[in-house]
Amino acid sequence: IANANMAAAIRLVTVAKGANPADYLLVAFGSAAPQHACSIARELGIRQVLIHPDAGILSAVGIGLADVVRHRSIGVELNLDQLSLSHVREQLDRLEREARGEVRREGVVPEQIVATRSLDLRYQGVDSYLTIPWPTDDDFTTAFAAAHRKQYGYLHQGRQLEIAAARVEVTGRVASELAPSKRATVSQPTSRGTVRVVFGGRMQDTPLYERTELTAGDRLVGPAIISEPMSTTVVEPGWHAEIFSGGELLLTDSGEHAAENVSYAVADPVFLEVFNNLLANIAAQMGVTLRNTASSVNVKERLDFSCAIFTADGRLVANAPHVPVHLGAMEETVRHIIAANPSLAPGDVVATNDPYAGGSHLPDITVVTPVHNAAGKVSFFTANRAHHAEIGGIAPGSMPPLSTNLAEEGVLIRNLRIVAGGESRLDELRSLLTGGAYPSRNVETNLADVSAQVAANRQGAIDLIALVERYTEPVVAAYMNHIQDAAEQKVRQALARLPAGAHTFTDYLETADGQSVPIAVRFTIHDSTSKHAATIDFTGTGPVVAGNLNANRAIVTAAVIYVLRLLVDEDIPLNHGVLRPIEIVLPECLLNPRPGATPETTPAVAGGNVETSQRVVDVLLGALGIAGASQGTMNNLLFGDTTFGYYETIGGGSGATADGPGASAVQVHMTNTRLTDPEILERRFPVRVRGFSVRRGSGGAGRNRGGDGTVRELEFLRPLTVSLITERRGPHPPYGAAGGEPGAFGRNRLIRADGTTVELPGIIQLSVEPGEVLIIETPGGGGFGKP
């Protein structure tokens, strides 16, 4: 388990840098690392491991031999051209002189001082940069293209490059050059005896060697143990070790490994944890790939996406810790795709954003990829869902506060095969995005992000195939089922700890026209050994509304899975097994509207995904009485014009529990996204961040206080359309539990250029002018227990 987790951490770091760990040699240092090195290297596909003669104290050795280094950098923010390069060169000349002076004052002679220069380059309109060493021919364009293609897998043809910053590193060489270590004539050392060691579940007699007695040229065949004063090296079966002239150990994988013999008829607790982590880490790597290759702020900076792995019949197995409202709903999407495409071929990829086929709302595009085995049969699916901040509709940002039907919310994508047999069909998606009554305002970014979603699924497929090659498909498939079984048992145990019987609760949504619409639940706990250990019945919930706070079964299911996951209070994945012991009763209502024949006659759902999902969590937790309500909203803010749309959600207070106070200024429950960095927000969009702070005292009083909300102030720099979808502005505050007081309502207001203040409702679309300031005060969380 430990080795698998360490390998996963290494893989995440290397994938984020666009590197394949299998292309490198693994250096093991520290007292324990050589014990794990062979296993970790094999997990990563690395064939060789290098162990320094002072591996156990290598960090201390390194400090003693370290060079004297000084770094200097300067912000540039200029387009890349000859004029800007000339300007940057002059600035770096000055910085280099300063740094060289500091290094000389450390006692390093000028002849031992070297300097290297680099530029932080990025495409115009993109926030992340790559650091490019200064080419001898000054051809940064070619060097950047090579680096970008290596890390991200694509280029933005024809887009202007800009210099974000310039850097110089001045190094004073202190340590003398070491002679290169070489192979020596092969010899066979004599062991000091044998010890009994378990490898691959089997006890083996293993030779024991003292490293101090090994000489250059000695070659050992694993399994073997090499002991030394500061460390111990384990040479696993299938590896051999040789000693170089400098005393280094080079371990090499012979490649003679059969698929691991893992018993799978019954779950082994160790391998259950191993596979759980392996699959979750594949999903996490998908997320890294998606973030790296995407173009939009919403994906790269706000991380508004989720990645997951599914069985051949579409059951959710594993996911990365992304956005709960995405993760719990994607299973229904994948199952709809399977039903509509029973014969997906290798190289096919399907996209959808249909809220009535497992989707959440139109900005959330889901990309689904089948993973075929060697016989051409679908074995698994990889899928991800990403929020596109612009997908068309009657308002920039594609979440119009006042939409009344699905057509007004953007472009509907239904079961579109965007890759067929490995051939891109994005032109069909382009035609869809540019057509219709309300086309997307930013088609190129849509296409770039969808391409990134395809790449993320491909990464997941590659990793799943590698997992099958290592363990065999029957083993992987069996442990996917075992993981779901384990999740089911954990949920049953959690439900058994709750009081039996029916627990009811009702809370309310506040619509744009001032209505209070109930969401009611009856959470009944049965015998934990029965087929359904609990029934969650939403009978009594209000009817379909004219606005866009309608949700769907997938969103409700996501909220239920999330709350069940909270009850377990252990680190288990959100997967299909969580729902097995649960019966969900969902009549036709605002949580389960009936679609119309066309988008124009289909109920709107833009706010249901973000706001109604939060209220469903509130009523479920309220029924159980285990926490005060959290802020109960995502505080959705959108602004834009005919050329762009921007979207963010704003954190607030979380509810207190019997165990402690609520957290302040956090995203809660069904969202897990970040805010865009102020520097990036101000550079990319016509807005200035005037303030962002904790709203002190907004959490509800109680034995444990609710968390405080936030105050966000934005000044607009040009005429824009602004949309707000923000619940808990009154008359229903975030409730307290067990006698705790409710959290404070949220509040929205606009400061006009002349200084007058306009109070704004929770759901509104308005026009703003340059110099006007929007202030959003988010709700606090409810308290727990009497104050």
Model feature map: region roles:
Residues 1-5, 9-21, 28-787:
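C-terminal, non-catalytic interaction/recognition modules in large multi-subunit enzymes and RNPs
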